[in-house]
Regions:
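Lipid interaction determinants
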Residues: 29-87, 91-226, 235-279
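Bacterial N-terminal signal peptides that target proteins for export
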Residues: 2-13
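Hydrophobic helical h-region of N-terminal Sec-dependent signal peptides
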Residues: 13-21
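C-terminal motif of bacterial Sec signal peptides marking the signal peptidase cleavage site
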Residues: 22-26
Length: 279
């Protein structure tokens, strides 16, 4: 029994040392200009991550697309409300951040309720909260140091705090006019009307994005043409889509094996999903 008490005291002592160490690490250089220089800049830190602003979490894609996703909620009657996506753009010019949510899969949404505006003096600051200590198994202690957060000043003079949520490992986008996230061959099923007898027929469709700014559509043995595309701020503009002489623009999201193309208006939206393997 005495041995058990001694072991417990040792564990408590180790945890106390760990807490002391992380506290000193977090606070030791808070007034030291040299320590501030070690912080990553906001322009390097912001892209490709999810950030919490107020009560919402936003995805800051590397191609400057800004996305917020609402959660599906269970209502009083036991029904599940629909989850919505909110799309916009973000730009960081020097230390000035501009952001706005401009469209959504929710009809007639209120854009003013979401993160928007221009913020100056945007910079990172070190979180001095002390981090967390956890133990997954006896004798094992994990120390998690806090991530720096981002601060900016709005046009009203108030500070805006942007807190790190998680890294977006699935973000393969870039800010070029031929975003690499789209590159490759994508498959779908497409229904076309047979001009001979007026019946609908389902075909396997291929959409092939090339790095040179061309995209080829191949649908069964009835359609095969090549057109051009350009990307900007998470929107792709196509010279034609599926059919010739059918120009189109979409907000695009690429998650692993799927590319989702959203056509969003004020009152409705459509979403075409293309896959990296035949369906």
């Amino acid at each position: 029994m005495k041995k058990s008490k001694k072991t417990l005291r040792q564990i408590i002592a180790l945890m106390a040392i760990a807490f002391t160490t992380i506290s000193l690490t977090a606070c030791g250089g808070s007034d030291d200009d040299g320590d501030k220089d070690d912080l990553i800049t906001a322009s390097e830190y912001l892209p490709g991550k999810e950030w919490t602003i107020g009560n919402e979490t936003y995805s800051f894609y590397k191609n400057h697309l800004l996305v917020c996703e609402s959660s599906a909620n269970v209502t009083t009657g036991g029904l599940t409300s629909q989850a919505y996506l909110y799309f916009g753009t973000w730009q960081l010019d020097g230390n000035r951040l501009t952001a706005a949510i401009t469209s959504s899969t929710q009809p007639n949404f209120d854009a003013s309720k979401f993160f928007h505006g221009t913020y100056s003096n945007v910079h990172t600051e070190k979180d001095t909260s002390g981090g967390t200590i956890s133990s997954d198994k006896p004798g094992s202690i994990t120390i998690t140091e806090p991530k720096p957060y981002i601060v900016g000043t709005g046009t009203d003079g108030k500070s805006c705090y942007i807190y790190y949520h998680k890294n977006m490992t699935e973000d393969k986008t870039d800010e070029t006019i031929h975003d690499r996230a789209l590159h490759g061959t994508w498959y779908n099923k497409v229904q076309l009307t047979d001009t001979k007898n007026g019946t609908m027929k389902t075909y396997e469709a291929k959409m092939i994005f090339n790095a040179d700014g061309t995209v080829q559509f191949v649908i069964g043995d009835v359609i095969d043409f090549t057109t051009t595309y350009e990307t900007k701020n998470g929107t792709v503009t196509l010279g034609s889509y599926i059919l010739k002489d059918n120009p189109a623009s979409f907000i695009y999201l690429q998650y692993g094996p799927v590319v989702s193309l959203y056509d969003v208006s004020q009152t409705r939206y459509t979403c075409d999903r293309w896959y990296n393997t035949p369906q």
